[in-house]
Amino acid sequence: MLFSEQLKKEAKPIINQIYHDPFIQGMLHGNLPTEATKFYLRADASYLNEFANIYALLIPKMGNLNDVRFLVEQIQFIVDGEVEAHEILADYVQESYNEIVQEKVWPPSGDHYIKHMYFNAYAKENAAYTIAAMAPCPYVYQFIAQEALRDKELNKDSILAKWFEFYSTEMDELVIVFDNLMDKLTKHCSEKEKNEIKQCFLQSTVHERNFFNMSFNEESWSYGGMKNE
């Protein structure tokens, strides 16, 4: 079994939990609360900006020009392409996407996730650590989207079905490239290093779950019992 396949196998129980948590189930049935949807859009706008920055940190660690070119294309996709998925959610709540994201949020779970990725990008020389921190994001979206399209419970009359359709294919190339890079970059790693990389991947998968739950619950910072508004 390839190392990338092993990572996905071990992450599957977490991804199954994500699928059955309230946020994705709300999308599946077409009844995701409006405020949870808007909170997700605001949080994800901040997250994707940082995700693009982490791609930029990953580029100098790449020794292959084709890999560099692909990462540059992914930055462009984050800037332009992924907005299409966000527009679907904005249409669902019948508000302008640009107006929704004018209000900024930086919740605890999103903060922890982003710092987890930055830590691995800065502290670890081997790019496998950075990729392990980043790869669960596209893989989780691909998996839950494809699972939803197979699910008889999917509300096909809801515009949210288009969100699943978008992610069911848009992540395919990125997942393949990340898998190939992961297998190549860990080929000569020690078992200790591979275990660290695996933990990094699984932690990011947990962060993905926390991000969806954070959005559903409209999570905020609490200082001494007082919420920071």
UniProtKB/Swiss-Prot annotation:
Subunit text? Homotetramer.
An individual GO BP term: thiamine diphosphate biosynthetic process
Keywords, ordered alphabetically: Hydrolase, Thiamine biosynthesis
Q: Output the InterPro entries linked to this UniProt entry.
A: Haem_Oase-like_multi-hlx, Thiaminase-2/PQQC, Thiaminase_II, Thiamine_Salvage_TenA
Spell out the reaction equation it catalyses.
Answer: 4-amino-5-aminomethyl-2-methylpyrimidine + H2O = 4-amino-5-hydroxymethyl-2-methylpyrimidine + NH4(+); thiamine + H2O = 5-(2-hydroxyethyl)-4-methylthiazole + 4-amino-5-hydroxymethyl-2-methylpyrimidine + H(+)
Pfam families in the record, alphabetically?
TENA_THI-4
Q: At what residues does the UniProt record annotate the site feature described as Increases nucleophilicity of active site Cys?
A: 47
Presence of the UniProt keyword Hydrolase in the record = yes
Which species is listed as the source? Staphylococcus saprophyticus subsp. saprophyticus (strain ATCC 15305 / DSM 20229 / NCIMB 8711 / NCTC 7292 / S-41)
Its ancestry begins with: Bacteria, Bacillati, Bacillota, Bacilli, Bacillales
EC number(s): the record gives 3.5.99.2
**GO cellular component terms attached to this protein's record:** cytosol
Domain of life, source organism: Bacteria
Q: Which residues bind substrate?
A: 44, 141, 167
- Catalytic residues as annotated in Swiss-Prot or TrEMBL: 137 (nucleophile), 208 (proton donor)
- State the protein's name: Aminopyrimidine aminohydrolase
Family (UniProt): Belongs to the TenA family.
As recorded in Swiss-Prot or TrEMBL, the protein's gene is named tenA
Task: Give the metabolic or biological pathway.
Answer: Cofactor biosynthesis; thiamine diphosphate biosynthesis
Q: Which Gene3D superfamilies match?
A: Heme oxygenase-like (1.20.910.10)
